[in-house]
Amino acid sequence: MTLNNCASMKLEVHFQSKQNEDSEEEEQCTISSHWAFQQESKCWSPMGSSDLLAPPSPGLPATSSCESVLTELSATSLPVITVSLPPEPADLPLPGRAPSSSDRPLLSPTQGQEGPQDKAKKRHRNRSFLKHLESLRRKEKSGSQQAEPKHSPATSEKVSKASSFRSCRGFLSAGFYRAKNWAATSAGGSGANTRKAWEAWPVASFRHPQWTHRGDCLVHVPGDHKPGTFPRSLSIESLCPEDGHRLADWQPGRRWGCEGRRGSCGSTGSHASTYDNLPELYPAEPVMVGAEAEDEDDEESGGSYAHLDDILQHVWGLQQRVELWSRAMYPDLGPGDEEEEEATSSVEIATVEVKCQAEALSQMEVPAHGESPAWAQAEVQPAVLAPAQAPAEAEPVAQEEAEAPAPAPAPAPAQDSEQEAHSGGEPTFASSLSVEEGHSISDTVASSSELDSSGNSMNEAEAAGPLAGLQASMPRERRDSGVGASLTRPCRKLRWHSFQNSHRPSLNSESLEINRQFAGQINLLHKGSLLRLTAFMEKYTVPHKQGWVWSMPKFMRRNKTPDYRGQHVFGVPPLIHVQRTGQPLPQSIQQAMRYLRSQCLDQVGIFRKSGVKSRIQNLRQMNETSPDNVCYEGQSAYDVADLLKQYFRDLPEPIFTSKLTTTFLQIYQLLPKDQWLAAAQAATLLLPDENREVLQTLLYFLSDIASAEENQMTAGNLAVCLAPSIFHLNVSKKDSPSPRIKSKRSLIGRPGPRDLSDNMAATQGLSHMISDCKKLFQVPQDMVLQLCSSYSAAELSPPGPALAELRQAQAAGVSLSLYMEENIQDLLRDAAERFKGWMSVPGPQHTELACRKAPDGHPLRLWKASTEVAAPPAVVLHRVLRERALWDEDLLRAQVLEALMPGVELYHYVTDSMAPHPCRDFVVLRMWRSDLPRGGCLLVSQSLDPEQPVPESGVRALMLTSQYLMEPCGLGRSRLTHICRADLRGRSPDWYNKVFGHLCAMEVAKIRDSFPTLQAAGPETKL
């Protein structure tokens, strides 16, 4: 018995409870009218087996293959399979002749005469199938006698599921053939055989895995089906027309009479579950359930097939051209079919099926001879263009992630698909699904509308499809910088350019961004914001209540400085993180936010639904043990979201700081709604820079979550879920430095009036800040006008002369080194005096750190960091000068713009920042010397205005002075001293006093660690 791709199979499972222990022997059902049950032997015996296996009579319809062929294999009734076979190609209706009633079978029986080989094959298959059923019966009977008389529901369900899947596999794999047999038969095909095989395609096509489309079979499951259990009813229908028309008029993947519903899966040859919900690869649509739905579907199918003859009349005139086109496309089509080996596994069939779909798409791209008709072009073009466009769209994503080379354009989609599979993208299997299901291939990669001007992905499918996450879980390799060991050095810093580009400010508001203001301007804005906020509070605060007062700590109380040396992620304030790594958020927390933003935006109720405590605890331990190598692939979105909430809840103080948290709450409690934004802008400017950067990253991230309609989490919903964790509401800590006085709850446990008011204000405030996150981090324009003269005076300019002035001086015979000579002499003088007058402070990672005030009265200090390096001075100079990528993890790109003279050049480099904050761009004039006494070397640099504007990559920062001094200190060793003062924009002088010195010390430590440490092997010997 055969079941081809054009058949319709329906499985119905009826779960019945047993009446008693002997119900298995009492309730017996015949599987066919040709069988009888023998009570003595407890077996089924055929009644007139010769009649059963004989060919059907010409005058009667052959119904032996259409009746029920399964019986109860256990007390729980198993699926009843009903098979309808299409007519053989020999009896296809000719054009111009209407099919008679005799041509239409009652139950779609097999038509035509069968040869002796076909009869022998069918007998062998029928006997094998019946033997298989009897063996299952005996196994189950013996198992039931040994076990308890009454089976558990779980056991019955397992037996039912296993039996039904074995039956489905036997049916569905019977028509497939191995790829090697198909290749062998196709290699020896001729022109006549090609034509013969084309005409017999309706039967041959389903047997070759090349033409088996996953979308051509529909699997219908009940609407109340629970994934993981076998369904009550399972219906598999083909999309091929039931009429016996030639396949030239029907292409796999087209909908004929079955447009009303589509299954959520199409794999019928795999051991994997074919009814589980797979939303990522198979877009589900509403499934019609029940007998009424099936009747409606049958009526719709019949109506569609009734118009098929009219359509064929219009298409039949193009038949000759179609056959010419088919010969040109498939010159090696094999003439015959070979027997499939029974041992072919369903996994092999599914693999061959995916590969052959890619071959089919590549062959359908351009016909070699002849011109395809209009209807054929309409069907071929979507299948060809979409895979061809996929590599071009995935290329920016591959460049951004730097995990694999971007696929090069290729003439055939099959080659593109092969390259996509090697580069971490999804193979042609997903592409064919997208085309068949009515979605473009851009659903699995970043579409052109989701790419910004720089070519970076905006929605991070990052977005290369669900299967691309397998490669994302591997250790990330640093982007190739083309310099030495950087080709294989892993990057610990997160590159999240799509988050930066998606929140890039507009040209009108770019100059008002806080992160573009100089340090002196930020200092003025602090004073103006404090005055404005004081005016708001004095105007709207109730006079007799203590509202706008920052309580001072007790006079004799000593605040013990906490020790964070044993902590890495949780409970560590942003200031410690930025001193350690240069970024206020840990890398693992940024990875968690990126994972949620790129792959979990469609999770309904994210941040509202709770995760599993045990899994959250495991994630927390992973963050603490290896904060730079945490992979969230495959983790539940709700677990990762709860982990984020725990991080902000476990901070020593709220992200708004203990001093300003009450101020933020009072803004949304006392001020009118139209004053919220102005007051919140003033309060945000008063936050420490590291806290403000964390708050900006969090609010931009939450705005992206709220903008996704699929998760049903608006800004208000997110505020309700996150406000208690971010504001630290109703959390009292004995050792907390917070001056806020918590209101005590009543004895019955109810929250007090102040608690309710604080919760309401926090929810409204966080919702407002998420909605207006873009404006919240901009400088108020009226404040800039009020500070007009002083604000403009605080804007810095490059300390050195412009490049045009240097060229004029060089033309006049003045050496360019004279412009840097003062800088060099200051460095040599300080070194000769052993840096007298510098104030030492504790430095990280075995470095010496010191600072002093600038002689020009600028609020930014000079910082000095020094350490010993296991390399001679000349090698250290080359490492600093030409191999920055080896020690600067934040470096994005660097280039020498122009070599002005020996030892003097114009240098441009860009460093990254924590997303979504902009990158820092530097254009410096640098000069070096390697002829100092005792073999010492030095390098000095400072910013200048280039002659031609250099395209900015973010914010143009100012390097006021940068000096490197390499002094020999032993055999093969040197002492490296780095003196630096820079305005990175967007940071206050207080940030430079607390953070910038640590960043300089970390820089010299990375230069030191970039050289291998040589250790002597073996014990010391006395000479």
Swiss-Prot record:
What positions are modified (Phosphoserine)?
S108, S235, S238, S498, S506
User: Listed GO molecular functions?
Assistant: GTPase activator activity; lipid binding
The protein's location, in the record's own words, is: Cell junction, Focal adhesion
Looking at the record, the residues that make up the START domain are 809-1017
GO terms for biological process? actin cytoskeleton organization; regulation of Rho protein signal transduction; signal transduction
Task: Please list the residue ranges annotated as the Rho-GAP domain.
Answer: 573-777
GO CC annotations on file? focal adhesion
Cite the residue spans of the region called Disordered. Answer: 46-67, 82-161, 387-461, 467-486, 733-757
**Superkingdom, natural source:** Eukaryota
Function as written in the Swiss-Prot or TrEMBL entry: Accelerates GTPase activity of RHOA and CDC42, but not RAC1. Stimulates the hydrolysis of phosphatidylinositol 4,5-bisphosphate by PLCD1.
Q: What is this protein called?
A: StAR-related lipid transfer protein 8
Identify the species of origin. Answer: Homo sapiens
